[in-house]
């Protein structure tokens, strides 16, 4: 079974992991409502995609008290 010949130092390990960071998401404004959304996806606020409204946005109903 293979075993490392030398122990990796902290700086070597951390240098290798320097490229593992998560990048920030690429956001684009919705052409209909100007809210930022992910590209190539339906707008979560208005339901607009490319040429028209694909989904009707969900409207939250207020809770009724008993």
UniProtKB/Swiss-Prot annotation:
InterPro entries: Ribosomal_bL32 (IPR002677), Ribosomal_bL32_bact (IPR044957), Ribosomal_zn-bd (IPR011332). One of its GO terms (cellular component) is large ribosomal subunit. Keywords: Ribonucleoprotein, Ribosomal protein. Pfam families: Ribosomal_L32p. It comes from the Bacteria. GO terms for biological process: translation. Residues 1-20 are annotated as: Disordered. NCBIfam families: rpmF_bact (TIGR01031). This is Large ribosomal subunit protein bL32. The lineage of its organism: Bacteria, Pseudomonadati, Spirochaetota, Spirochaetia, Leptospirales. The gene is rpmF.
């Amino acid at each position: 079974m293979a075993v490392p010949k030398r122990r990796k130092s902290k700086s070597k390990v951390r240098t290798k992991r320097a490229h593992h960071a998560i990048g920030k998401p690429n956001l684009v404004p919705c052409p209909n409502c100007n809210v930022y959304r992910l590209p190539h996806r339906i707008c979560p606020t208005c339901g607009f995609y490319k040429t028209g409204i694909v989904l009707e946005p969900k409207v939250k109903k207020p809770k009724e008290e008993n």
